[in-house]
């Protein structure tokens, strides 16, 4: 396992990491598991993991957070920009966790069979740069499974329209950007986030040396139904849009 690393695999910072994102998740870490309980989204994520990841695959979990997916992977390394998140993931899973930026992965070329990134990590970075780095560290024909926030999240759109937040919806649609706000121990914390659609991500994948195997959606209805419809046309209105992409050989 250690051959994959450019240097020591324990808590490793890159000099260009985005400090605002790091600080947000450092403060959020202790409350993260309580705030983000979505068992139906996790069920779909794990369904795909079990389908696509085989015994013996060496897996990189980008934006592993507190280790929810990392703990079910047999042979894996976690990566997160937040030291506090990484500490929790390390304690929860007893697996190696690297603290680093997804845009600058501290691993050697062609180190991993598969990579995953669910929920939040890729919403805060330069997606093309992150895809380029994932392509670099994956072996030929390696698979990258990931989700990003959907610009056409119907539940979010309806919720904000009903609240009268028309300007918020309009700005999000136009700029494809937004802000996540939480209150932790009486302190309001914020982080910028990005929204995507299927075509934008598919184009980026193609440009960075991937071919799309299939797409899916998570948190469509936030109910048991999601397990049966995550590949249907309803994925276009999910909270998160997902991709299973294969690295093109000799990239």
From Swiss-Prot:
Keywords of this entry: Methyltransferase, Transferase
The record, for InterPro entries, names:
Methyltransf_11, Methyltransf_Superfamily, SAM-dependent_MTases_sf
Annotated GO biological processes are: methylation
| GO molecular-function terms, A-Z | methyltransferase activity; S-adenosylmethionine-dependent methyltransferase activity
Q: Which Gene3D superfamilies match?
A: Vaccinia Virus protein VP39
Q: Name one Pfam family in it.
A: Methyltransf_11
Q: Which residues form a coiled coil?
A: none
Output the PANTHER family linked to this UniProt entry: METHYLTRANSFERASE, METHYLTRANSFERASE DOMAIN-CONTAINING PROTEIN
Similarity comment: family membership: To M.jannaschii MJ0638 and MJ1123 and M.tuberculosis Rv2003c.
- Name the record gives this protein: Uncharacterized protein MJ1252
Source organism of the structure: Methanocaldococcus jannaschii (strain ATCC 43067 / DSM 2661 / JAL-1 / JCM 10045 / NBRC 100440)
């Amino acid at each position: 396992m250690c051959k994959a690393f450019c240097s020591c695999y324990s808590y490793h910072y890159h000099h260009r990491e985005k400090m605002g994102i790091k600080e947000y998740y450092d403060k959020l870490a202790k409350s993260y598991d309580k705030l983000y309980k979505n068992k139906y989204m996790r069920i779909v994520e794990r369904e795909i993991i079990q389908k696509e990841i085989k015994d013996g695959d060496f897996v990189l979990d980008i934006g592993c957070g507190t280790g929810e997916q990392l703990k079910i992977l047999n042979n894996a390394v976690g990566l997160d920009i937040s030291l506090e998140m990484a500490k929790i993931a390390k304690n929860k899973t007893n697996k190696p966790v690297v603290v680093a930026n997804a845009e600058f992965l501290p691993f050697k070329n062609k180190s991993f069979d598969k990579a995953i990134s669910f929920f939040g990590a890729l919403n805060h970075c330069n997606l093309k740069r992150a895809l380029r780095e994932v392509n670099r560290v994956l072996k030929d024909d390696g698979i990258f499974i990931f989700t990003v926030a959907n610009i056409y999240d119907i539940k979010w759109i309806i919720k904000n329209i009903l609240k009268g937040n028309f300007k918020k919806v309009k700005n999000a649609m136009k700029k494809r950007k937004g802000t996540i706000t939480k209150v932790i121990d009486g302190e309001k914390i914020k982080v910028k986030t990005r929204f995507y659609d299927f075509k934008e991500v598919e184009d980026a994948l193609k440009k960075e040396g991937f071919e799309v195997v299939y797409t899916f959606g998570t948190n469509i209805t936030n109910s048991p139904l999601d397990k049966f419809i995550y590949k249907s046309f309803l994925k276009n209105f999910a909270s998160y849009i997902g991709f299973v992409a294969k690295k093109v050989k000799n990239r």
